[in-house]
Each structure stands twice: as structure tokens, then as C-alpha cells.
């Protein structure tokens, strides 16, 4: 790579699958990534020089289809200079280099708005909305080019704050109020919510998760501290039969959150670290029994539990989360969430940012309340296989795959996650890698 001057700035991106990759610039090692690491971005301004620069990638293969991709963008007096891996590179062992094509632009961040926040972005800017007395104007919202935002409905003065929603089999919208109760909205000729809200339940407190499945409405009622099933037993359109299927004791801050229908037909529920773990013997626990000796007197960790449709059986799927609000499944049947950071740890060496996790059975993601989180070298902690996407500061709420949306294919396969703190939606692109996925995010 030849530069007309010392660079004003230079950025490197590196991705390696099923191999360890070390990048050397002018015989100096600047970056090493493991076989299953996320895509790495690195400032290499100080590593490049005026004139000719030698870029070398040293690879060590592991089991699987090894591949590497690298790009460098350097700004000098002549403009932006680009260098990408490709067939023009030279392999030290002749005949060993194979061109596998280009990386999808979304996975490489080409044409995408960055997730990065500046130090000036106020984490508590949401407080500015507490004094709002009118609806948000669509003109103030920004979307990715090619997408349009349409306001469907604004909460009425007597409809409260909304925390979750679901569509019934007839396509009518059900919304949970933050304080208590469930509202139902009829549809107009265009299929949009219309008319006055109908109160279909006034007792359940803060239902953060709603799911229509198996001829019933399931509600994860956080402040009622239980999972409920609501049914229309007499077919008159009202959900008069309310059953408590599972009770979950504990606090309510990081509480009983979203619900999703698993590919196994069970009801998957995701909880934050305020909720007590199910008592031993009441559920089947897929995590390691070796965790017991390291739990401490108070467990305080978020977890995923799946419940049979009738509530009779339950299993803890994975644990060690902080406050993951949403859960959804991709087309392959894999579950994902968007987990919270501990904002009070910002600036400390042990700060753990918000991140996207694949919720594979048996995993412990290592979170323990406050500073009790496990180090990554504990043998049954999922950090040994590396987190999949670091999303920085934020406050995670709901997540949803676009598989049912009438979007372009690249955006049907995305996981959409809502960051409440900064009022933004992130689109997470994925590519299969073994039993898991490589991920890249963009501001949607």
C-alpha cells in the first residue's frame, strides 16, 4: 500500500472464520483475532507511513472452512486510499490462495449508518421526553434510505403508557398498559388500528410479554409476578378465563419480560436479574450443575425459561444475563436477545456493554448482579466462544426478526432491536458460521 503522505487517518477491518489471523504492517504485529471472533475494527493511523507499506496476514487454520477478509481505508494528501483482500494478493505458499468472492456489504458496513455513539451523546436524554405533551411528529424520525415511517396510532389520554403488543388471529392489535390492563383495537379496511380501545383485561399488572398461541393469549405479567394464559372459553370474543400457569418471585425492575413461541411449540420467556431463579426441582435445568458451587448466596442473574402450552412442564434454557427484554427466533430456529449493560460501570475496566447473544441451550453468559460477573475463562461461560456483537451503550427493549416483513431479502433476515435510551432501532445482519453466526449492526 503506497501513500502520498503520512496518513491523516487509517482504519482496518478484519474478519477471520475458522482460523487465527495476525496482521503485520511493515513487519510489526498490529492485530490478532481468533477463529470465532467478531469482525475487528482498528485505528492504524500510527502504523502506516509515507511511501510503501507492506501488509501481511499470517494465518493458522483450525477445523472448518477457513477464510479471511481485510480492508484498509487510509486518508492521505491525495485522498482516501483503499486496500482489500482479493486475488491480487500473493500467498507465500504457491497455489494455496483461493478467492471466495466478496463479503456482503451489510456485513462489512458498506453504505450503512454506524452504531457508534460519541462521548457527547447523553445516556439520560430520554428524560427530555418526560415533559412532552404532544405526539412525536413523523418528520422528526429518521429511517434508512428506501424505508418510510408511518404513524399508526398515538395513545389516548386514558390509554396509559404502552409496554408490549401482539396481534390476535383476526389481526387485531392487543397492547399492554404499563400500569395494568390489556387493550384491544379493531382494524379498519386497511388493516390499521382504528376506533376506541377496548379493555379486555383490567387486572394483570405490566404485561411486558404478550403472545397469541395455541388458541390463547399468554401474558408475562411483571408486577403480577406470573405467566398467565387467557382464553375465550365460550367463544363470545372476551378472554374471561384467566389461569396462572407459572409464578416467578423476586423484584420487578429487571423483571419478567418478553415471550416468544419456540419452534418446539413451547412458550419461551426471558427474565432479567431481578427475578428469582425457579426453585430446584420445579424445572429441568439445562445449564451445568457445576454452577451451583459458584452461585453464591444470592443468584441474581437473568435467564430464559420455556414452558409447555399448559404450563405443566418448564425448563431453564440458559442463564447469566442481565436484563434482556426481548426474544425472537430466526428462520433456522435459533433464539436471540439484546442484553443490557450496567450503565453505572461505564468507564471501568469491567464494564460490559450491551450486546447481542444467541441463546443456545445450556449456556451461562456470565452476568452476576453488580460486580459479581464471571471472568471469561470460567469453563461453562459462553464468552469462551466470544460474544457475537458489541452494541455499545444503550438500553435494550424489544427484538424482532424481519422474516415476516415485506422488506428486501437482506432486511428480512435481520434482527431488529430497539434501544430505548437513544430512541433508535438497530438492524443486525447475520451470516451462518458453524452452529452460530457472524454479525454486523447498522443504525436502521
Language-model features, listed with the residues they occupy:
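Beta-propeller domains with acidic blade repeats across secreted/periplasmic ectodomains
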Residues: 120-444
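Aromatic-lined ligand-binding clefts that engage carbohydrates, nucleic acids, or primary amines
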Residues: 3-23, 55-57
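Short strand-turn-strand beta-turns centered on an Asx-Gly dipeptide
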Residues: 24-30
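Short beta-strand segments within Ig-like beta-sandwich modules, predominantly Fibronectin type-III
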Residues: 31-36
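Surface-exposed loops/turns
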Residues: 49-50, 145
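Extracellular and analogous surface-interaction loops
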Residues: 1-10, 44-49, 400-406
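An acidic-aromatic loop/edge-strand motif
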Residues: 50-121
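Short strand-edge motifs at loop-to-beta-strand transitions and within beta-strands
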Residues: 38-42
